[in-house]
Amino acid sequence: MTDTLSRLAEVLESRKDAAADSSYVASLYHKGLNKILEKLGEESIETIIAAKDAAVSGNCSDVIYETADLWFHSMVMLAALGQHPQAVLDELDRRFGLSGHAEKAARTAE
């Protein structure tokens, strides 16, 4: 799984200096973080709607498709902020085996 994320991160990084009209990602970078966040919000809503529909229909193909869009745009956001998806994977590894209640309590204590 991480190989796919690493390869995508490399492509996203390479688009940062590309001409705006050369790719969708390059155009997002040129429009700035607010546009990237707008797209991320749209994809979040589309994922939620797809999940609600899947709960009724039993067909998860749309929720998988929309989740891929959500992950993709999350990675564009991370790249725009100079972060690699490995940082998110490291955070998930840190939380693995940690009680959700304990993790939340640790955050609120800080």
Swiss-Prot record:
It is found in: Cytoplasm. Pfam families: PRA-PH. Keywords: Amino-acid biosynthesis, ATP-binding, Cytoplasm, Histidine biosynthesis, Hydrolase, Nucleotide-binding. GO terms for molecular function: ATP binding; phosphoribosyl-ATP diphosphatase activity. Pathway: Amino-acid biosynthesis; L-histidine biosynthesis; L-histidine from 5-phospho-alpha-D-ribose 1-diphosphate: step 2/9. It comes from the Bacteria. InterPro entries: HisE (IPR008179), PRib-ATP_PPHydrolase-like (IPR021130). One of its GO terms (cellular component) is cytoplasm. CDD domains: NTP-PPase_HisIE_like. GO terms for biological process: L-histidine biosynthetic process. Its EC number is 3.6.1.31. It catalyses: 1-(5-phospho-beta-D-ribosyl)-ATP + H2O = 1-(5-phospho-beta-D-ribosyl)-5'-AMP + diphosphate + H(+). NCBIfam families: histidine_hisI (TIGR03188), PRK00400.1-3 (NF001611). Belongs to the PRA-PH family. This is Phosphoribosyl-ATP pyrophosphatase. The gene is hisE.
